[in-house]
Amino acid sequence: MRFTSFPCSLLALCLFATPPLLAQGENDQPAPAGAPAATQQTPGEPGTQTGQPTPPPAPAPPVQFTRTIPVPPVRYSGSLGSTYIPLDSWMYPEIMRLYSLGFIDTVFLGMRPYTRTSVAHMLDASAGEIYNSDSDEAKDIYSALSRELAPDLEIPVDAHRGHSEIESVYTRMLGITGPPLRDPYHAGQTIVNDYGRPYAEGFNSITGLSVRTTLGRYSGYFRGEYQHAPTLWGYSTAVASQLSFQDEVFPLTYYNPTLPYGATLQGVDTFRIQEAYLAANFASHEISIGKSDEWYGPGRGGGMGYSNNAENIYSIRINRVEPAYIPFVSRFLGPIRYDFLYGSLQGHTAYNSPYTHSEGFSFKPTSNFEFGFERTIVFGGKGHEPVTWHTFLKGFFDINDTTEPEKIGRNDPGARFSAFNFSYRVPFVRNWLTFYSDSEAHDDVTPISAPRRAAMRPGIYLSHFPGAPKLSWRVEAVSTDPPTGRSIHGSFMYWEAEQRQAYTNKGFTFGDWIGREAKGGQSWLTYHLSGNEWVEFQYRNVKSAKDFIPMGTTQNDFTVSAVKRLGKDVEVNGWVQYERWKAPFLLNGNTAAQNDTSIAVQLTFYPRNSIRRY
C-alpha cells in the first residue's frame, strides 16, 4: 500500500500555526458567558499603583448560569492546563445535541475527548446566539454544561494558580442472567464500549473515583476502580482450536485474551487504573504521558479508528486541543485539529507486546462541515521486528507496497489501517438533521481511494421532532465486511498476516466493537428531561459472516435506560438490556436461541465541596 508523507509535513507546519483569533486577542481565551465581568479601576482607587495596597479579596460568589444576556467575558490564558472529559461522561451526547441544534460551530465531532476548557470556549463562542434563540433545549444544555465546567473558569489570566478536586465517586451494580457473549474478536459482545471491563453471568460490580488537578500549564488526572466479576467459561477445545486455526495463532493456549477457552476468565477481584496521566499545555498542545481516553470518528455507537471498547493503553500523546489556523491552508480547509499517539498493546500472543502509533487530522472548512483522516499502525513485538527508531520511522514515512520478504523481516512497516470520517449539517434543516460517516481501510491510503474495500459506519442524528422538542433520534449502520474478495475468514479488517491480533488490547477490539467481518446497526430514541437527564430506548443488531464463524452468528439487543439527577450532585444511571443471540458453532451445533438479561444501576457523586485551590 502507498502512504504519502503529507501528514508528516502537515504536522510540522501545525506546530508553528497560530491559534484561532478570539474576540479578546490571539492567545487569550474567554470564560463562559455568565461569569462575572472584569472590572476596571481608575487611578487613586484601592488596588492601583497610585492608591492603597490591595486588601485581601473577598470570596467570590458562586457563578450563576441563567438565561440572561451574557456579560462581557473575562480574559483567560490559552496556555493553562486542563484535563480531558472522560468518554463515558454525560456531557458528550449533550454536546452533540447542542451542535445539531445549530450551535457551538467550533466543535470537532470526529476527534475526542475534549478538555474541559476547550468545551468552555465552545460554549462561550455561542453564548450570545443561544441567548437570542428561542430554543429552550439549547439553553438547558448550555446551563448544565456551564455549571459543570465552572470550577475550571475562576482563575485570572495573570495568576498561575491551580486547583485539585475529587471529580467523581461512583459504583455500579450489574446483574446478568443467562449466558452473555464476551468474545470481541470473534463472536461478539453483550456489553460494548465499556473500557474492556470484565463481566460474566451473575453479579458484577465496579466502584471507583476520579481526581484531577491543575497548576498553571500543568495538569494531572487519575481514575481507578475496583472490579468484580464471576468466572466466565469459554469455548470447548474443538471450538477454540477451529477459531485459533482461522486466526493463524498457534499453538492453542489457555492464555489468549482474544480467545476465551475453558475457564479463561476466572473470578475477577482486582483494582484497575482506568486513566492516569500527567500533561502540560504548550501553545494549545496538550502533551501527556500515561493512560487516557481516545476516540476517532463522529459516531456514537463506535469509532473505526479508536473507541473506548477496550482498556486504554499507556501512551505518549500530543493533542492540539484548540482549533489552529494555518496560513494559506486554513483559507481553504478551515481550522484544523490533530492528535498523535504512541504506546504499547497488551494481551497479544502473536506477537507479544507490540507497539502502536496513530496520527489524526480533522478540518472544518465551514461551520456545518467537518472531515478528518486518521492512520493506525501496529508494529514490533517479541519474535518479530525490534521496536527502534528505524522501525518506527519506516512505518511513519513508508510510501511503498510491502513485499513478502520485507513483511516477515526486520523492515516490516507494520499493520497499517487508515480511516476517514465526515459530518455535515444538512441544508434547509441544519438545526434539525446531521449526517455523518466513519470508515476504515486496511492496506490502502484512505478509504476514499478504495471504497469497496472499506468498513463503514454511516449515521444520522435528528436533534428534535416537530411538536416534540425534547425527543431526539439517532441511527447508525455498521459493516466490516466490504464487498471484496479479500474479506473472507475474518482475515481482512482488524487483522493482518503478521500482526494477527492487531487491533486488540487485552482481548478487546480498540476500534469499533462490531469486530471482524460483521454487519449490524444501532438506533437510539431519547426523551430529554433536562440538560443532563434523559430516558432512552436502544436497539442493536449484529450478524457475523458464515465464512468467518461457521454457521454465522446473530445478536439482537433491546435496552431501556434512564439518567436522572438526585439534586445537583448525584446522578443515577440505570439500564435494562434483553439480548437474544444465536451462534450454533459455539454451542456444538445447537441452533436454539440463547437469551440473557442485564440489569445495571450506577450511582455517581460529584462532590463540589472537594475543590482545593492553591
Feature roles, as predicted:
Residues 8-18:
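Bacterial N-terminal signal peptides
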Residues 21-202, 210-216:
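N-terminal periplasmic/intermembrane-space "pro-region" immediately following the signal or transit peptide
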Residues 81-84, 107-110, 131-140, 213-218, ...:
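Short loop/turn motifs that connect adjacent beta-strands in outer-membrane beta-barrel proteins
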Residues 109, 195-200, 262-266, 304-307, ...:
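Outer-membrane beta-barrel domain signature
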Residues 210-252, 366-368:
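Carboxylate/His-rich catalytic cores and anion/metal-binding grooves
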Residues 220, 236-335:
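Well-ordered mid-protein domain cores that form the structural environment of catalytic cofactors
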Residues 294-295, 313-504, 516-523, 528, ...:
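Signature for the C-terminal beta-barrel architecture of outer-membrane proteins
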Residues 361, 564, 593-614:
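Outer-membrane beta-barrel "beta-signal"
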